[in-house]
């Protein structure tokens, strides 16, 4: 039985005040909102649910695994100084201008165009200015604020395996190195945390079959060609699904679990966000330098950039801090 849940920005606004208590830390993956709402819906029918988390990391499902190397192969021939100039030019053009270009090309060539071309162009422009190798590209793909020093008023930065490249395993395959690092960081620190705390917030237990140790061991024994083939991830899982599920339900673009956060921050969530990002408040609390944050906030409001993820990280810290201060 297939069930769909539709929710609005008002539903999100109802959930947001609960997030600091649900996560008990400044957790900043905006898909935490739909995760909580779908858990709430599932709890009406079951007490235990199965989750497919881990499938992407083990069987090569994320776009970065099969696009990362292609992007780097196209960029690596270009001298860094030229990449930097190209990146600066791309960033100098407003998001709306790139979107208009996409719409014009769509009409001119009778094609589908590129969805959110402006956002994608700005992300590419930022990476052109900073990446020197494929590992740099990977770090840029998984990071929001690339370096915390200009934003956070603190001399100490917590180090993880991502900051210690000398500790990275000697894996020849760029794709499998990304999969390993995601399995060690993104999966436990983001995905599993997000799902477990959102689900337990409504007393729904979740089980993760892909993370059975036998499945993990088996997946890492498989050659990469059984995971990524013809520019498509999770090849082996697809072959199994073809036996049980119509192909039309499988061969679709990866959708993720995102919400229209960029639009909502300019609209129904704006007042909530502006109260948390108040310049005097940021200065008084002393955790952040207001200048780079407010610069991105104003850029976002004006439509000159899509900084939803950068801003959400700060907003979730601010919301958590407000909750802690109110408890005292």
Where are these regions (language model features)?
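ATP-dependent adenylate-handling active sites, centered on carboxylate activation for C-N bond formation
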Residues: 1-154, 174, 198-244, 270, ...
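Globin-like tetrapyrrole-binding proteins
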Residues: 187
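Basic, amphipathic alpha-helical recognition segments used for DNA target recognition
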Residues: 184
């Amino acid at each position: 039985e297939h069930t769909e849940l539709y929710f609005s920005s008002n539903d999100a606004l109802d959930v947001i005040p609960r997030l600091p208590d649900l996560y008990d830390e400044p957790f900043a993956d905006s898909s935490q909102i739909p995760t909580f709402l779908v858990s709430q819906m599932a709890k009406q029918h079951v007490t235990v649910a199965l989750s497919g988390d881990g499938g992407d990391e083990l069987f090569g499902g994320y776009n970065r695994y099969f696009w990362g190397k292609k992007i780097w192969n196209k960029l690596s021939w270009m001298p860094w100084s030229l990449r930097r100039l190209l990146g600066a030019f791309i960033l100098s053009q407003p998001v709306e201008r790139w979107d208009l270009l996409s719409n014009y090309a769509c009409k001119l060539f009778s094609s589908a165009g590129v969805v959110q071309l402006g956002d994608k162009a700005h992300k590419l422009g930022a990476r052109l200015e900073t990446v020197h190798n494929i590992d740099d590209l990977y770090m840029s793909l998984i990071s929001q604020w690339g370096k915390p020093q200009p934003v956070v008023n603190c001399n100490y930065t917590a180090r993880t395996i991502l900051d210690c490249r000398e500790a990275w395993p000697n894996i020849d395959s760029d794709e499998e190195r990304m999969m390993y690092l995601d399995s060690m960081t993104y999966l436990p620190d983001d995905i599993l945390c997000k799902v477990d705390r959102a689900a337990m917030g409504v007393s729904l237990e979740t089980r993760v079959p892909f993370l059975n140790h036998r499945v993990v061991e088996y997946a890492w024994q498989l050659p990469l060609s059984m995971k990524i083939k013809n520019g498509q991830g999770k090849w082996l899982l697809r072959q199994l699904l073809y036996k049980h599920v119509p192909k039309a339900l499988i061969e679709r673009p990866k959708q993720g679990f995102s919400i229209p956060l960029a639009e909502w921050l300019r609209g129904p969530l704006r007042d909530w966000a502006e109260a948390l990002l108040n310049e005097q408040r940021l200065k008084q609390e002393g955790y952040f330098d207001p200048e780079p944050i407010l610069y991105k906030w104003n850029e976002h409001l004006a439509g000159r950039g899509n900084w939803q993820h950068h801003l959400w990280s700060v907003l979730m810290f601010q919301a958590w801090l407000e909750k802690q201060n109110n408890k005292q």
